[in-house]
Regions:
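Single conserved hydrophobic/aromatic residue that forms the stacking wall/gate
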Residues: 1-7, 11
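ABC-family P-loop ATPase nucleotide-binding domains
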Residues: 45, 55-132
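Helical segment within the ABC ATPase nucleotide-binding domain
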Residues: 148-161
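Walker B catalytic motif
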Residues: 135-139, 146
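Conserved H-loop
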Residues: 162-178
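Conserved beta-strand-loop-alpha-helix hinge in the C-terminal portion
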Residues: 182, 186, 190-213
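ABC ATPase NBD Q-loop/coupling interface
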Residues: 16, 26-42, 110
């Protein structure tokens, strides 16, 4: 998606950032208006956002953080909380998806993690929460080729017929690993071009100026 400020507003509106006010319109997700829900309830409804620059949370262990998140989600859905043994079993299964080292899983959230480890940790969180819609904001930013491959493979393993993923990137290299079904180009706050995966290759080769010319700019 080729957009900067508007892109951030679009994403933050969906996850409920209080710094942004929606003055008109609605965001409907599975029949519910997200604008009427708190950020945590939007998450419980199945929306996940990965950050371009994941933050560190000193003093909060990954185990406690994820157990609280998973059980709050289950409570919202009317399901019983996972026992300690059930949760640890689930955590082991999901760690394997992104090859997350057990030592990292037992440390404070993102504290002292490398850039690649932070991104891998976010895909691990995505695996634990099993969202219906994941928004990955420049997940490839700052990753070396090995970390990029592992993160992309994790995303691919989590793909199901019942889930969707919006991948925001400025580079073709991520799409060498994650094959998109549809590519959208946003310009000045609106979608101006939609096509299949071949559009990403064309953008990599030509840039974006040809789209502006098509728009008469």
């Amino acid at each position: 998606l080729s957009i900067r400020r508007q892109r951030q507003m679009c994403i933050r509106d969906r996850v409920g950032n209080p710094a942004f006010e929606v003055t008109k319109g609605s965001i409907t997700f599975y029949g519910k208006n997200l604008l009427e829900l708190s950020p945590e309830d939007r998450s419980h409804e199945g929306i996940f956002l990965s950050f371009q620059y994941p933050v560190e949370i000193p003093g909060v262990s990954m185990v406690n953080f994820m157990r609280a998140a998973v059980n709050e989600q289950r409570k919202y859905k009317g399901l019983p909380a996972l026992t300690a043994s059930e949760f640890l079993k689930l955590m082991r299964e999901k760690r394997a998806v992104v090859e997350l080292d057990n030592k990292l899983a037992n440390r404070s959230v993102n504290e002292g993690f490398s850039g690649g480890e932070k991104k891998r940790n976010e895909i691990f969180q995505m695996a634990m929460l099993e969202p219906r819609l994941s928004i990955l904001d420049e997940t490839d930013s700052g990753l070396d080729i090995d970390a990029l491959r592992i993160v992309a493979e994790g995303v691919n393993k989590l793909k199901t017929p019942d889930t969707s993923c919006i991948v925001i990137t400025h580079y073709q290299r991520l799409l060498d690993y994650i094959k998109p079904d549809i590519v959208h180009v946003l310009y000045k706050g609106r979608i101006v071009k939609t096509a299949g995966p071949e559009l990403a290759l064309e953008l990599e080769e030509k840039g974006y100026d040809w789209i502006k010319k098509e728009l008469g700019e």
